[in-house]
Amino acid sequence: MDNGIFIVATIFVVNILYVTIYTVRLLLTMKGYRYLAALSSVFEMIIYVVALSLVLDNLNNIANVLAYAVGFGVGIIVGMKIEERIALGYITVNVITKEYNLDLPNQIRDLGYGVTSWLASGRDGERMMLEILTQRKNERKLYKQIIEIDNGAFIVSSEPKQIHGGFWIKQVRK
């Protein structure tokens, strides 16, 4: 293999590794996994120095710079895909039903979720408001289950910053 092609390929692959680790490390930091984030940053910096030195030592070849830039973009995509798979943390899902249905909270509880419900008033009458805490990795599954039960439900999710007490207390502790 030609040395120039080998350097371009190496820069590309090493930068994908660097940015993937960077993306995951950033998400670990935001989720509060400080020691795991610190450990990953060590590997991130080693890989970064290798990739950057390869580019800086070979700046006369535009393909090296392009490999670095494209590897950066691909690394972000790969890092985000990994984060979606591990889906760290929890989400709070708020549901406003189309109609007031006393059985709905129990149907969702039967699926294994903790549910708090209360009467709400909408423009067109009484609604039920539900608040559900679940792991992020279950978010899509929960959305599908809610829509199967109430196709007209309004669903909004957000990430809680702190959790204390309630249905999940034993499972949420880090």
Curated annotation (Swiss-Prot):
Superkingdom of source: Bacteria
Topology term for the membrane: Multi-pass membrane protein
Keywords, comma-separated and alphabetical: Cell membrane, Membrane, Transmembrane, Transmembrane helix
One Pfam family recorded for the sequence: DUF5698
TM regions (residue ranges): 4-24, 36-56, 62-82
Subcellular location(s) per record: Cell membrane
GO-annotated cellular components: plasma membrane
The keyword Cell membrane belongs to this UniProt entry's keyword annotation: yes
Kinase in keyword set: no
Similarity annotation: Belongs to the UPF0316 family.
Record-given protein name: UPF0316 protein lin1888
Organism: Listeria innocua serovar 6a (strain ATCC BAA-680 / CLIP 11262)
Lineage: Bacteria, Bacillati, Bacillota, Bacilli, Bacillales
